[in-house]
Amino acid sequence: MQSRLMPSGGPGRRWAFLRVPSTPQRRAFASTRFYFQDIFQSQLEDPSSAAVYSSLQASRAVPQTLTEKIVQKYSVGLAKDKFVKSGDYVTISPHRCMTHDNSWPVALKFMSIGATKLHDPKQIVMTLDHDVQNKSEKNLQKYRQIEDFAKHQGVEFYPAGRGIGHQVMVEEGYAWPGTLVVASDSHSNMYGGVGCLGTPIVRTDGASIWATGKTWWQIPPVAKVTLTGVLPPGVTGKDVIVALCGLFDKDDVLNHAIEFTGPEETMRSLSVDARLTIANMTTEWGALSGLFPIDNVLKGWLKGKATTAAMGLAEGPFKTLAPQHFTHPLLEQLFANPLTADKGAKYAKELFLDLSTLSPYVSGPNSVKVATPLKDLEAQNIKVNKAYLVSCTNSRASDIAAAARVFKEAAEKNGGKVPKIADGVEFYVAAASIPEQLAAEEAGDWQALLDAGATPLLPGCAQCIGLGTGLLEAGEVGISASNRNFKGRMGSTDAKAYLGSPEVVAASALTGKLSGPGWYQAPEGLTEVVRGEGDGIREEDRMLTAEQALEKLIGQIDNLVADGEKQFAPEESEESSGDSLTEVYPGFPERVSGEIVFCDADNINTDGIYPGKYTYQDDVSQETMAQVCMSNYDAQFSSIAKEGDILVTGFNFGCGSSREQAATAILAKKIPLVVSGSFGNIFSRNSINNALMGLEVPRLINRLRESFSGEGSDKSLTRRTGWTLTWDVRRSRIEVQEGENGPKWTHQVGELPPNVQEIIAKGGLEKWVKNEIGA
């Protein structure tokens, strides 16, 4: 079936969309739909407008998002003229790879596969930041092992107390705009604040990159988040991301890559520090990256870094490579042709938020999905026991300055007398890095906090990850400028943790209750935060250039094509999709078939799949792993499921922790394939890394639920369905037989390309690496 755009009623007036059969169909039809013009003939006759039209025609075949463009640069082994897109599995060779305190476990994996030398030492950065307050011999020994390994391999190493790894990556220039940088930590998203595509990996990926320079990645669906308006005084980047997490709280961007955009005035109002904060907490919003544009705001920040480095001011009593990474020639090269999303790039969804309608927000208690305007919490007089100005989210010099301003202004109102934090409150401060602390000291802000009674800590993750001194005790309430407030993360599970901006943390420490500094004044008539789907621009306010009008028209036509396929020929669409055959890697099965065993639940987490009490027992046998597989979800699973079954589950299967045994236990049960509505991202990575196959087929889950919802009192957690599923790998298609005498149907699934097949065929990523290095 071919889709053709035909002029109707004369050139430049209307367009008619015709579906023209290119092959015999079981039913013939044609549909015609009309759209009013968005561009006039006079514009097309103008040479500049005509040039725009020609360029759009030439480029629209492969328009890419900014995320896709960056991945394109760092993908290896692509076919000639291949343009990557969301959903593709690619082999990536990232610009940099950072590991922190987990460097030693990664090193053990690296050595266990027979590797002895890093593929590219310059690709790797090691930092110590998580447990820096722990002076036990066991921890110090681990730190020595990491440092010795780094020195032996020639890796850039930053010791405990130098700074949080993510901050080091940014301030040292490792996270460079337009590059792909990964780290074995979930807050790698932070690099997006400087236009760098940062995304997390797991430890096995780290070992693979160390040994081969490569790992695999599936490009996520990309969500465009348009920010409009300008933040009112007293509202910060932290309020933006806290509000986004709470206002869009239905997994709107779960496992998506985010691209932030907006009018020039809006983007100009967001400093790089604010962008880093927002990008950092896109992790809590559920995203795999949070990318800001490479624009003039970033250019100004980079120029400042380059000038400081050139003058020698970046140097100090600490190691820095900033003078090598931030140079004016590099900046000129970067901004000579900065990467941007193509016109007509496809986004999985679009959301918008009007910053001018925001007020200070606080997250919690104990959930980032609960976001409340500060004024509502202030009215509740919530007593605060501990306050934390820590973490890579909000402990830069600008954040420390904002907190210090609270005390400085209070001193001015008190005749110059320095105020103290409230009785019964403990206030902890740890800078994101030594350079940030030194900048705060030079400005007098660090001392202002100490004079008020704050307790200084080494630069490090500290209470953000529940390590070190000053953790929340049972019954206590804490307010933190960090990024995560899950129950028990910052101390006792019987404590309550809130998240807010640095000034809210400081004001709460000063008053002894959850409060702000009073800098925000609500605009008259403001009743709600303006947000929603789309780009937030009202149609009556939209002024279209010729280029924008054509882009819109092309988008309408593409959507029309998709709608037509869905509405008129779903069967043909399914079959035609299978005409493009996928190469099958030698040793990978062309077909996988088995009976469906159905676990009808969403959000089955990794503890439900493999109990936590076994996670750190290294001597658990395969038989035991098979026996306890899914036991926390259903104790009867082991007796119901059989070898060769295909496990089908609900949505977001494998959410939770990063334990690899969640995948290996299913393999121990000799189940070769898991099908779900959707997977948790880290589970997906661990599955492929350990040779467990997986497919996302929402249609199958919905069909099973329709078929078995009327089973009366039978509420089995695990059900043998009598249905069979066959996955045709070459045709990227499944066939489902609904019981012996039931209907049979097929459905197209995502392609599993040969590079991923190879990892699974080799027995997982570690064995693939062994093969690559000839170990």
UniProtKB/Swiss-Prot annotation:
Keywords: Amino-acid biosynthesis, Iron, Iron-sulfur, Lyase, Lysine biosynthesis, Metal-binding, Mitochondrion, Transit peptide. Pfam families: Aconitase, Aconitase_C. It is found in: Mitochondrion. One of its GO terms (biological process) is lysine biosynthetic process via aminoadipic acid. Residues 1-29 form a transit peptide. Its EC number is 4.2.1.36. Binds 1 [4Fe-4S] cluster per subunit. Pathway: Amino-acid biosynthesis; L-lysine biosynthesis via AAA pathway; L-alpha-aminoadipate from 2-oxoglutarate: step 3/5. Its cofactor is [4Fe-4S] cluster. [4Fe-4S] cluster binds at C392, C461, C464. Belongs to the aconitase/IPM isomerase family. Catalyzes the reversible hydration of cis-homoaconitate to (2R,3S)-homoisocitrate, a step in the alpha-aminoadipate pathway for lysine biosynthesis. This is Homoaconitase, mitochondrial. The gene is lys4.
